[in-house]
A protein has these predicted regions:
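Surface-exposed coil loops of outer-membrane beta-barrel proteins
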Residues: 4-21, 30-110, 120-124
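Detector for outer-membrane/organellar transmembrane beta-barrel domains
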Residues: 107-162
Length: 162
């Protein structure tokens, strides 16, 4: 796997290091609740791409070095057709065997229209006890016929004043 922090360097305490998705989901017309191992909700179409569908040399440093597959809970609400508001709490991608009880939190919004798709999020990833990496991610995808164009903005910091 290309992600150097992927489930503790290829393994995890439960023995599911090579498993990307293992979830149990309840869904109805208005919301869903998911528990298990899934992708961290980062508002980026690049980061949302599955490993085998990505070309290592063309990916960002963030994609290549931060594991998207973590254990946790997520809940989504469908306010209107084609839109989802998501809350998520997972293990932090900075967790290791030595420092395990670190968590990541996400608030994400996905929207789909005829020629435009959005995937925006704000995230907190705990990197040590009491310290968080904060991020704002704005993924925008535009469609014109068979052509697809992604325009994304991501910023991450320890201090908001940076």
């Amino acid at each position: 796997m290309n992600h150097s922090l992927a489930s503790f360097e290829g393994g995890d305490a439960l023995g599911f290091g090579n498993t990307n998705w293992l979830t149990l989901t309840y869904e109805n017309d208005y919301f869903y609740i998911t528990a298990g191992k899934e992708d961290i909700k980062v508002g980026s179409f690049e980061y949302d791409t599955y490993d085998l569908d990505s070309y290592w040399e063309m990916n960002s440093l963030f994609w290549n070095n931060c594991s998207p597959w973590q254990w946790g809970l997520s809940a989504g609400w469908y306010p209107t057709d084609g839109q989802t508001l998501i809350l998520q709490c997972t293990n932090s991608p900075y967790s290791t065997y030595e420092v395990f009880n670190l968590f990541a939190y996400a608030l994400a919004w996905r929207g789909e229209w005829d020629h435009y798709e959005s995937y925006w999020s704000t995230n907190l990833w705990q990197n040590t006890k009491g310290e968080y990496v904060k991020s704002l991610n704005l993924g925008n995808r535009f469609y014109a016929g068979d052509f697809r164009f992604d325009l994304e903005y991501s910023t991450r910091t320890i201090e908001w004043s940076d």
